């Protein structure tokens, strides 16, 4: 077991992981509007595959620094690698969507954040989209640093700036979207989550994570 395995096992018990599965089914259903189901999708730093198992796509790919292949559906193509080495592991220009959730804050520097977004841009075909769910330090405040493996502080503005430096064009930016963690105030149960994502006014009350959708220019 790696150090990361120890961290995540302590952070998320089995009951909470099962709860996240049902929450993510509705989050992905909402995000699907920006995802072309006729093109391949890759989930970077996929963890237990909360996103990739629910998305509709012509091919489903997932990557993580840990070998989580046993936790993923059998049709998901899994690559065990660091996100900063994806150019060596995946075909450039192949994907219609690259997805990242609660990942960029784990990188070591803002320079690595820009480089990771450049890599995502390279993986996308023309018109392909990057979707990022990102804790926003301006909204979260000091609790952003409650996790020992958080290194980079990002707001909606710095996220957009990093995307522009990486060659991406912003399609949609929702500063307040999801609560900070599933341990917090996000409604539990699929029906409540479905209502939450369909009622933007409540995002302004509970949202601490930013939704960023960007496109590789055609």
Regions found by a protein language model. Give the residues of each.
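Short catalytic micro-motifs in class I SAM-dependent methyltransferases
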Residues: 102-106
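S-adenosyl-L-methionine-dependent methyltransferase catalytic module, highlighting the catalytic core
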Residues: 14-17, 84, 97, 108-125, ...
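Conserved N-terminal segment of class I S-adenosyl-L-methionine
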Residues: 1-93, 97-101, 114-117, 210
């Amino acid at each position: 077991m790696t150090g990361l395995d120890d961290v995540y096992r302590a952070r998320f018990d089995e009951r909470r992981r099962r709860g996240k599965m049902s929450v993510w089914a509705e989050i992905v259903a909402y995000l699907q509007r920006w995802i072309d189901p006729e093109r391949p999708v890759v989930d970077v730093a996929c963890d237990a595959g909360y996103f990739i198992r629910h998305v509709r796509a012509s091919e489903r790919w997932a990557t993580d620094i840990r070998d989580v292949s046993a936790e993923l559906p059998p049709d998901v193509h899994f690559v065990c690698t660091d996100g900063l080495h994806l150019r060596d592991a995946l075909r450039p220009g192949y994907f219609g969507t690259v997805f990242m959730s609660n990942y960029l804050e784990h990188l070591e520097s803002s320079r690595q954040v820009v480089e990771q977004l450049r890599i995502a841009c390279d993986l996308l075909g023309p018109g392909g989209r990057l979707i990022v769910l990102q804790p926003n330090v301006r909204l979260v405040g000091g609790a952003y640093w409650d996790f020992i493996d958080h290194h980079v502080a990002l707001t909606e503005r710095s996220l957009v700036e990093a995307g522009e430096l990486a060659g991406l064009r912003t399609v949609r930016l929702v500063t307040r979207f999801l609560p900070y963690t599933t341990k917090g105030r996000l409604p539990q149960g699929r029906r409540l989550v479905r209502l939450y994502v369909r009622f933007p006014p409540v995002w302004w009350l509970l949202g601490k994570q930013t939704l960023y959708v960007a496109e590789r220019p055609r």
